Amino acid sequence: MNVLIISDSHGLEEELQTIAKRHEAEVDLMIHCGDSELETRHPALEPYAVVKGNCDFAGDFKDELLLTAGSRKILVTHGHLHGIKQTLLNVYYRAEELGADVICFGHSHIAGSEVLRGKLMINPGSIRLPRVRRTESYAILTLENDAATVRFYDQAGNEIEDLQNRVTL
């Protein structure tokens, strides 16, 4: 199962549509981790399961979603309500409460993935305003049995190889 994860697009429309179209045949689920700054029913968000970010004032997005991808549960949140810029433990504990195996979040605009106490944490970065790295990014998570692979891509669809992460869940 493949899951496209994007976040912090901050008003971009065409780019969201281009990325969705590029990967629509290869992914089973598309997630937007907030700060789209678009209306809830905006056409650019149509293929995505979207949560509310701290810059999403229009629309009625939920603060979090619990999605199923194969046998795995994915917690989707923006991260600002969990203080992810200070610690990942708060969002980890929320995932524990919900029984989630994977946590997708944004807010910091810093692309990366890691396993914390058995839970895969993924921040796809930002396709508008990346931090730390200068490359706009999004991610694709591949789930296979007990293995997960996270690949990151720039806005043009080129893989950012040094961010790839393969883990056991």
Curated annotation (Swiss-Prot):
Keyword Hydrolase assigned: yes
Alphabetized UniProt keyword annotations: Hydrolase, Manganese, Metal-binding
Protein name listed in UniProt: Probable metallophosphoesterase YsnB
Origin species: Bacillus subtilis (strain 168)
Molecular function (Gene Ontology), one example: hydrolase activity
UniProt binding sites for Mn(2+) 2: D35, N54, H78, H107
Cofactor binding note: Binds 2 manganese ions per subunit.
InterPro entries: Calcineurin-like_PHP_lpxH (IPR024654), Metallo-depent_PP-like (IPR029052), MPP_YfcE (IPR041802), PdiEstase_YfcE_CS (IPR020935), Phosphodiesterase_MJ0936/Vps29 (IPR000979)
